[in-house]
Amino acid sequence: MEQISDTLLLIAGVIGLAFVYVVLVLRTRNQVQPEAATVPPNAIIVDGSNVMHWGGDPSLQVLTGVINRITDLDLTPIVVFDSSVGYRLMGRYLHGNAMATLIGLPAAHIYVVHKGVVADEVILDLAQDNGLKVVSNDRFR
């Protein structure tokens, strides 16, 4: 009798685990996926690492001045930085949220590329894919 009781408990446990698994799978399948971020129609890309060097040493003042002028023209700046931007400005890595705070833009409008990624390629792809203009001193080829 004890062996039957142990077997029933084992079966009940397996059924319980299977039930939990099915519920989790169904719950995951029914979740609504967020829509991909869209680029605003009035967007313009700013080569942040390039612009902050206008006039010599890296400067947030120069960059924010350019960004303010862009927003005064009712354009939405999308700023792309090299991964080394934080080291150049603050001596340490800065992610997109930190850069957004420093320059006063929404984090969704800032992109710090990963180490080893060429920011210019990201800028050109973004511009070409979305028909956007770029603010930079670089000669993209």
Residue ranges and their predicted role:
Residues 1-135, 140-141:
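Noncatalytic, typically N-terminal accessory segments of nucleic acid-processing enzymes
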